[in-house]
Amino acid sequence: MKRNHDFSSSDSELDENIEVEKESADENAGANSPLGSMSPSTTSQVQARKRRRGIIEKRRRDRINNSLSELRRLVPSAFEKQGSAKLEKAEILQMTVDHLKMLHAAGGKGYFDAHALAMDYRGLGFRECLAETARYLSIIEGLDNTDPLRIRLVSHLNSYASQREAHSGLGHLAWGSAFGTPPSHLAHHLLLQQQQQQGAPLARSTSSPPSSNSSSPSSSSPSAPSTEPRLSGTVISEAGQTGPLRVPPSTSLPPGLTPPTASKLSPPLLTSLSSLSAFPFPLSAFPLLSPSSLGPATPSSSLGKPYRPWSMEIGAF
C-alpha cells in the first residue's frame, strides 16, 4: 500500500493524513478492480479532499506570514529596517532570535516592570510614527531625502527618540514620586509668606526662621528693605518708602539671603527635577518661581510689575 509522506504542520494534520491514506487505498482498490476505473462518487470525494487540502495549506501560509509581520513590527532591529528594503523570512527570524538572546542575557530586566514595559512600547510607537511621518513627507508632500525641511524634521525626531531611550534608563519612578516633592517644598514657602503678611506689614525674607516674623513693625531697621530676596533687577519696596529700591546685578546679598538657584535647591527637589527629564514635556514650560512671587500681591501701591514668568509660556500648552 502506498504510504503518505505529507509533512504539513497544520492543526488538522492527523485528519489530513488519514484522508490521504484512505484516498490512496481507494485509488489502489480502483486500479485493481475488474472495472479498472473509480465510480463518479469516489472521484468527487477525491477532488473535494484536494480542494480542502489546498484551503488548509493556504491558511497555514497566511498564519505564518501574519506571525512574521508581527515579528517584523515588534522586533526593534527589524522594524528599523523595514522601510529601507524588504526583509526575508529568514532575516526576520534571525533578528527575533538575536533580540530574545539579548533579553535573556539581560535577565529580563525591565520586562517585569510595568512602567519600563510601557516605556519600551512607547519608544516603539514613537519610531513607528517617525516612519509614518517620513513616508507622509515623501508621498504626500513630495519632499525627497535631500530636502532641508525633511532632513531637519527627521533628524530632530531621531535625536528626540535617542534622548528618550537614554533617559528611560535613569530610574523607574512613578508619576506620583516624580511630582510629590516640589509641591511640599513650595508649600513651605507659601506658609512662611502667609505668616509674614499676618505678622508685619513690611516685606521680610521667606528663608528666615519663623521666629523673625514675631517682631513688631516698629523695630524695622535700615536693612529691612534688603531682606526680601528677589532676582537681580526686580523691585524691592517697603510700605513706608516713597520710591522703589532696585538691586543692581553686582549687589552681594548676605549668605542667608541669596536667591534660590538650581545649585542650592534641596536634594529631594533636585532628584524630582532630574526625574522629570524622562518625561516628554520640557522643563522650560515650568520655570522655577521665586518663593516671594508665590504669595498673593501686597496692597502696597509702590510695587512694580508682578513677576509672572508663566505669561511667556502660555503658548507652550
Swiss-Prot record:
<feature type="domain" description="bHLH">
    <location>
        <begin position="48"/>
        <end position="103"/>
    </location>
</feature>
<feature type="domain" description="Orange">
    <location>
        <begin position="121"/>
        <end position="157"/>
    </location>
</feature>
<comment type="similarity">
    <text>Belongs to the HEY family.</text>
</comment>
<comment type="function">
    <text>Transcriptional repressor which functions as a downstream effector of Notch signaling.</text>
</comment>
<feature type="compositionally biased region" description="Polar residues">
    <location>
        <begin position="30"/>
        <end position="47"/>
    </location>
</feature>
<feature type="region of interest" description="Disordered">
    <location>
        <begin position="193"/>
        <end position="264"/>
    </location>
</feature>
<dbReference type="Pfam" id="PF07527">
    <property type="entry name" value="Hairy_orange"/>
</dbReference>
<dbReference type="GO" id="GO:0005634">
    <property type="term" value="C:nucleus"/>
</dbReference>
<feature type="compositionally biased region" description="Low complexity">
    <location>
        <begin position="248"/>
        <end position="264"/>
    </location>
</feature>
<dbReference type="GO" id="GO:0072359">
    <property type="term" value="P:circulatory system development"/>
</dbReference>
<dbReference type="InterPro" id="IPR050370">
    <property type="entry name" value="HES_HEY"/>
</dbReference>
<keyword id="KW-0805">Transcription regulation</keyword>
<dbReference type="GO" id="GO:0000978">
    <property type="term" value="F:RNA polymerase II cis-regulatory region sequence-specific DNA binding"/>
</dbReference>
<dbReference type="InterPro" id="IPR003650">
    <property type="entry name" value="Orange_dom"/>
</dbReference>
<keyword id="KW-0539">Nucleus</keyword>
<protein>
    <recommendedName>
        <fullName>Hairy/enhancer-of-split related with YRPW motif protein 1</fullName>
    </recommendedName>
</protein>
<dbReference type="GO" id="GO:0046983">
    <property type="term" value="F:protein dimerization activity"/>
</dbReference>
<dbReference type="GO" id="GO:0001708">
    <property type="term" value="P:cell fate specification"/>
</dbReference>
<dbReference type="GO" id="GO:0007219">
    <property type="term" value="P:Notch signaling pathway"/>
</dbReference>
<dbReference type="InterPro" id="IPR036638">
    <property type="entry name" value="HLH_DNA-bd_sf"/>
</dbReference>
<dbReference type="GO" id="GO:0050767">
    <property type="term" value="P:regulation of neurogenesis"/>
</dbReference>
<keyword id="KW-0238">DNA-binding</keyword>
<dbReference type="InterPro" id="IPR011598">
    <property type="entry name" value="bHLH_dom"/>
</dbReference>
<keyword id="KW-0914">Notch signaling pathway</keyword>
<keyword id="KW-0804">Transcription</keyword>
<feature type="short sequence motif" description="YRPW motif">
    <location>
        <begin position="307"/>
        <end position="310"/>
    </location>
</feature>
<dbReference type="GO" id="GO:0006355">
    <property type="term" value="P:regulation of DNA-templated transcription"/>
</dbReference>
<keyword id="KW-0217">Developmental protein</keyword>
<feature type="compositionally biased region" description="Low complexity">
    <location>
        <begin position="193"/>
        <end position="226"/>
    </location>
</feature>
<keyword id="KW-0678">Repressor</keyword>
<feature type="region of interest" description="Disordered">
    <location>
        <begin position="1"/>
        <end position="59"/>
    </location>
</feature>
<dbReference type="Pfam" id="PF00010">
    <property type="entry name" value="HLH"/>
</dbReference>
